[in-house]
């Protein structure tokens, strides 16, 4: 089973007031932390979906050269998150990927173990439509989507994400993996979030 990562990095950082993925964290950047995690995982490829004008200085040179890292500027990214997701899904289709693991570039604490648990779960349940992370029964990224969902995902528009499909009776067609540590799925949206991230990284040095 071939599984790609779709790394959503085309947000407009409106709540941060500046390009949040460029913000430094030690020798890394906010946007490169989860990308490093994805590249260390068993994912076959990582499609990094960016805005067309993004010069991707936030991605370290060695990651850009990694054979699994494929940077894909999305020309319609300003039309909403669904456009970035569909850009990645189309690439997964073209490359005959059996599933796609959707990640957010602003979730710096995602671990390789989390990704591998999702991948193993999908490989153990090949007829499963999705594997989703949950916090207190709420679905959040990362989420792993079977190729059997690609057609439905390509119908999304605006700022809607895959989560809109993962509700009601459809939930019976997948698996959820509860996350008991909210820190792992923390996302950096505001200057206050960034300060929390800096403080946390300082503590764990």
Where are these regions (language model features)?
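Conserved alpha/beta core of the MobA/IspD/sugar-nucleotide pyrophosphorylase nucleotidyltransferase superfamily
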Residues: 1, 157-205
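N-terminal glycine-rich phosphate-binding loop and ensuing alpha1 helix
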Residues: 1-50, 55
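Hydrophobic residues at beta-strand termini and immediately following loops
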Residues: 25, 72-74, 133, 177-179, ...
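Conserved N-terminal catalytic core of the sugar/cofactor nucleotidyltransferase
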Residues: 33-98
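Conserved beta-loop-beta/alpha segment of the NTase-like Rossmann-fold superfamily
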Residues: 78-149
